[in-house]
Amino acid sequence: MLRKNLAAHAIGVLCFSSLVYGAEGDDLPQRAQTVSDVIDKPGVLTPKGQWSFDSSFSYTQNSSNKVSVVGYTVLPTLIIGRIEVSDADRTTLTLGLTARYGVTNATELEVRLPYVYRNDQVSTRPIQDGSSEVVNTTMDGGGLGDVELAVRHQFNFDSAPYWIGGVRVKSNTGRSPYDVTLGDDSTSFSDVSTGSGFWSVEPNITMIHPVDPAVLFAGLSYIYNVEDNVSIGDTDADVDLGDTISLSGGMGFAVNPDLSFSLGLSHKTILKSKVNGSTSDEAKLLQLDTFSFGVNYAYSKRSSVNVSAQAGLTDDSPDFQLTVRVPFNL
């Protein structure tokens, strides 16, 4: 029973962990359907010599409210400049195509091509002027995101827990935030970024422990951003984006051979960034916590539909993210 459950869930949860339903005795091995396919993390690997693909669509909504001083302070109670209240709503749509190839039964290669569309709406009101006028600014655009390459290896097969390690390399093919110029009004940008602007390397390890009919999973990763020289205004600077430490864990549960769901928690700590080797006094650690719920339905032996929702638990986290993925095995 445990083997059948593990074989039927593995393709639906590659991100957080896995369950797999596959008919024993099939001539061709099938890629597992995992709880991680619902949330997009490493999981059961592609069999040797086979290809697997998946298309994905994600919707992310994020909003922020802040009060800023445009000017400087002379004394704690004396402000020179304007006080502005701004409200920003950012919507991001991402279409992704991922291809995986099984080098061996224990090792797979992956490439991911994303297309990113962003719509940013910012409302600003200077409250010190006594004016009720609100300035609305809308910026939108899209393009190729940061292409990613990855390799994963499953270390053991005979006994649980199963351990999968990997390395993911993210390129800077997307439009960098530092390549976006100011518009004619000098208050808004002419376009939006579709990438981070930096290369990064992410080693990661995932633990999967089947407890029939459930699967427990946990993951640890570290994102190292490669320092680069960028143009900030009229000057050049060496920017070292803060690295990211990620922890995740949760549970996948098999309702029947075709349907499973997952619950998960994820925590990310983004370290302080540096410019020209020094850290600004205004820099701070960012803490991102999210709760995830996903459902995986295998409608055929070679394909399934995965729907997941994530809710932000901290101020720095995205408010909401919805992802739909359709894996397909050749």
Predicted regions and their residues:
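Outer-membrane beta-barrel biogenesis signature
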Residues: 21-75, 175-177
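Residues on the lipid-exposed face of transmembrane beta-strands in outer-membrane beta-barrel proteins
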Residues: 42, 53, 57, 97-101, ...
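Residues that define the transmembrane beta-barrel architecture of outer-membrane proteins
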Residues: 49, 91-95, 133, 137-147, ...
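Detector for outer-membrane/organellar transmembrane beta-barrel domains
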Residues: 49-64, 186-275
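Transmembrane beta-strands of outer-membrane beta-barrel pores
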Residues: 57-63, 113-119, 155, 169-175, ...
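Outer membrane beta-barrel transmembrane domains
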Residues: 66, 72-76, 229-330
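Repeated loop/turn-to-beta-strand initiation elements of outer-membrane beta-barrel proteins
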Residues: 107-109, 159-163, 213-216, 258-261, ...
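Outer-membrane pore/translocation modules
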Residues: 117-234, 283
